[in-house]
């Protein structure tokens, strides 16, 4: 059975990838001996993009995307990252947790263990959904615990020892439309149909609302423009956040 997931073509994932790649190029070298850990890697879509910076190891709790990631040729283990991760201290040059920590009651535990795994000077790169008042049915179906403000994310990174290198909102241009749509749906009590609605139980797909081809193409273009803007400035508002923290060379 062929497995398909929306990361390959959905505007939200392609926009996030462009913004992340833009930011990572500012901090990460491209070296064969550069080791990255992608925590909560899903089916490995971002491993493909992270691999341009070095060698990538993935961890994922759900066996379905683990199977898919391995079929794609990625080095992924099934593991619950809320537990101490099975690597020695100072093992990695960078750790990514991309839309991961919002699923966990104890988000600080993941950040703290990621800090342990990083070499001195290593980078922690995070994406999370932004602003609790934007809570929607997508948050419920994806088992989110919270959404964050920039100040909250900075505080959690600092609390676990990281030096803040960059924090920016993402999806700035679509923010007014997204906020209006969420509020209108909330008032109407409407629950949008999600992409995985018709999947067989052994298939895997990230829970994301589908978009028509014209809308998907337009929003993908908006994401390209926004990635160019993120190269220059931190955006003041958006539906998501991207953060980069660095483990100090000495403590």
Feature names for model-found ranges:
Residues 51, 70, 105, 119, ...:
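Short conserved AdoMet
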Residues 99-103:
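A short His-aromatic
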Residues 108-123:
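A short glycine-rich, Lys/Arg-flanked "PGG" loop and its adjoining helix->strand segment in the class I
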Residues 5, 124-146, 150-158:
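Short, glycine-/aromatic-enriched active-site segment of Class I SAM-dependent methyltransferases
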Residues 1-90, 94-98, 108-111, 213, ...:
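Conserved N-terminal segment of class I S-adenosyl-L-methionine
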Residues 70, 136-140, 177-181:
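Short aromatic-enriched loop/helix-cap "lid" or pocket-rim segments at secondary-structure transitions
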Residues 162-172:
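Conserved S-adenosyl-L-methionine
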Residues 174-251:
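A C-terminal cap/extension of S-adenosyl-L-methionine-dependent methyltransferases
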């Amino acid at each position: 059975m062929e497995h398909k997931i929306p990361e390959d073509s959905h505007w939200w994932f392609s926009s996030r990838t462009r913004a992340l790649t833009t930011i990572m190029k500012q901090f990460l070298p491209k070296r064969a001996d550069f080791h990255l850990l992608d925590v909560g890697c899903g089916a490995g879509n971002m491993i493909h993009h992270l691999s341009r910076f070095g060698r990538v190891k993935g961890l994922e709790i759900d066996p379905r995307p683990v199977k898919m990631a391995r079929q794609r040729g990625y080095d992924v283990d099934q593991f619950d990252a809320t537990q101490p991760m099975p690597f020695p201290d100072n093992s990695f040059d960078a750790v990514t947790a991309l839309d991961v920590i919002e699923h966990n009651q104890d988000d600080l535990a993941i950040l703290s263990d990621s800090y342990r795994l990083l070499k001195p000077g290593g980078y922690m790169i995070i994406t999370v959904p932004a602003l609790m008042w934007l809570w929607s049915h997508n948050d419920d179906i994806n088992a989110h615990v919270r959404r964050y403000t920039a100040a909250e994310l900075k505080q959690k990174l600092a609390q676990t020892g990281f030096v803040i290198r960059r924090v920016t909102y993402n999806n700035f241009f679509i923010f007014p439309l997204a906020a209006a749509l969420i509020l209108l749906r909330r008032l109407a009590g409407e629950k949008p149909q999600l992409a995985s609605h018709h999947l067989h139980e052994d298939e895997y797909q990230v829970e994301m609302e589908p978009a028509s081809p014209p809308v998907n193409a337009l929003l993908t273009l908006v994401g390209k423009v926004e990635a160019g803007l993120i190269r220059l400035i931190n955006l003041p508002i958006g539906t998501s956040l991207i953060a980069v923290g660095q483990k100090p060379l000495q403590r």
